Amino acid sequence: NQGRAVKFFAEQVEKASGGKMRVRAIGSAALGPDTQMQQALIGGAQEMMVGSTATLVGVAPQMALWDTPFLINNTREADALLDGPVGDKVKAALEPKGMVGLAYWENGFRNLTNNKHPVAKLEDMSGIKLRVMQNNVFLDSFKALGANAVPLPFSELFTALETRAVDGQENPYNTIVSSKFYEVQKYLTVTNHVYSPWIVTVSKKWWDQLSAAEKKVLQEAAVKSREFERKDTREEAAKALADLKQKGMQVNELSVADANRMREKLTSVHSTVASGVG
């Protein structure tokens, strides 16, 4: 669905600029992983990207706020937080580092899959070898919950699950479906433990060369595409969960009481994020 949103964004840009501005989309990580593209934006070799906020922590530590487990309970809260002054403040932290944030899109609420057993309570996390993003908040969070957290690039994840190098992973439903993790994972626990945004960013070197009118076209197109992308992502997520059940994954939902027990285990992680974000 990210591809559909980029196409929508490109159409908005072309339309609003009267055909003077055109967006060429390059998908499937053809320009490298997020971290490589970030450096290309900072250096001015690439103009724009849509990527995970979690991979931007190395550029702007404030982005770690969005990795905080159990920070956001539902999409209404997510929209209010990301599109309000807090979201703007976190976005603004990118500018001194050479990037400009235009809008937050939605990746979705992350949920847990594994091959060992259903995770219904905190104790069930113990001993699960779980792939996490190469990000300290994710690493520290799952260690605190008792899992054996293994940082791995996303591109290596399917093979790691298939060969049982790791037992499980955590991602939004749409990613679990599109990456076919249901082929190599048996259990899905609805944890909604982290709300993951995407962010549309541009190279500051390039941005500073644009006219005020050109900047306005891009900014407004990013906001319009945000609304399109969120609606699309939420519709797809509902379908994806039904699809995963149909494909044979055993699905259980973490109770509120057990989610609260996990939240209590994460107080030190929350404190670390708070001091890092400021």
Q: What residue ranges belong to the model's regions?
A:
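N-terminal secretory/targeting leader peptides
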Residues: 1-77, 85-88, 92-278
